[in-house]
UniProtKB/Swiss-Prot annotation:
Record's protein name: Nucleotide-binding protein THA_1518
Keywords carried by this UniProt record: ATP-binding, GTP-binding, Nucleotide-binding
Pfam families: PapZ_C (PF22740), RapZ-like_N (PF03668)
Binding site for GTP: 57-60
Task performed by this protein: Displays ATPase and GTPase activities.
Positions with a binding annotation for ATP: 9-16
Family: Belongs to the RapZ-like family.
GO molecular function: ATP binding; GTP binding
Organism field: Thermosipho africanus (strain TCF52B)
Superkingdom in the source lineage: Bacteria
Length: 279
């Protein structure tokens, strides 16, 4: 195991948002792991997973053992472990619960939200003492919290994934891509007898399209759009961008363009290339 992140802190302070970001960064994430299971489960998971993150909070039974658990983990995992504590002002937490219309998890123990927040602060005292990083989210929106965590955890961030999918419009649009680029306005190799049975990966098809007016310019245009988006995706802490390239049947033009883009982005990113409709 390379990295172990423990998220703890007040309900309404953003633990779910933080856990979601860590999942985007490639962590194996567990929400509200029972505290008595931490030292049992962790060795099993760490055998096959490099990056692990889980939430420990006041909902957990036997939370009074938090100091014992964290002390043991710090001894065992040392530099691999970071404990991040999320907090916020009472008024902010009250407003967030009102906005989401959710009940505070400790409200059943007391008779008001204010008392539930105070009780949770008391329960979390030991967890706060063992924390490596404390983030006050009172003045942070979810986007800003994501940026803060990316800044803190940048050194453990996984490589950005660019997923490129070629497809044929006649077989339906892909539903899981961020951008779709249409290449149907270029000549179709399907209507050239010697190229019909080949795919966009074939050298003769590639030569035909390379020599088609506007192809190189369009590749550069797509690249400019994708580069523009990539910078902003990375700044927001997102770790994946998906591109769909479509032609009529998904055999020639879309495959060629997808292969060209994959070749470009493999120099900087992890690339997953799929040709959905190639026969």
């Amino acid at each position: 195991m390379k990295n172990l992140i423990i998220l703890t802190g007040l309900s309404g302070a953003g633990k779910s948002t933080a856990l979601g970001l860590l999942e985007d960064m490639g962590f194996y994430c567990i929400d509200n792991l029972p505290i008595n299971l931490v030292e049992t489960i962790l060795p099993v998971i760490s055998m096959n997973v490099d990056n692990i993150a889980f939430v420990l909070d006041a909902r957990s039974e036997n939370f009074e053992r938090i100091d014992e658990i964290l002390n043991n983990l710090k001894k065992k995992y040392a530099s691999n472990l970071k404990v991040i504590f999320l907090t916020a002002k009472d008024a902010i937490i009250i407003n967030r619960f009102a906005h989401t219309r959710r009940n505070h998890p400790l409200l059943k123990r007391v008779n008001s939200l204010e008392k539930a927040i105070q009780l949770e602060r008391e329960i979390l005292t030991k967890a706060l003492e063992f924390s490596d990083i404390v983030i006050d989210t009172s003045n942070l929106n979810p986007h800003q919290l994501r940026e803060k965590l990316v800044e803190i955890l940048g050194s453990v961030k996984k490589k950005f994934l660019v997923r490129i999918l070629s497809f044929g419009f006649k077989y339906g649009l892909p539903l899981d891509v961020d951008f779709i680029f249409d290449v149907r306005f270029f000549p179709n190799p399907f209507y050239i007898k010697d190229l019909r049975e080949k795919s966009g990966r074939d050298e003769k098809v590639k030569e035909f399209l390379y020599n088609t007016q506007g192809v190189k310019e369009y590749i550069e245009m797509i690249k400019n759009v994708v580069d523009f988006a990539l910078k902003r995706y990375e700044n927001e802490g997102r770790m994946e961008l998906s591109i769909g390239i479509g032609c009529t049947g998904g055999q020639h033009r879309s495959v060629f363009f997808a292969e060209e883009l994959a070749s470009i982005y493999r120099q900087r990113y992890e690339v997953l290339l799929e040709h959905r409709d190639v026969k």
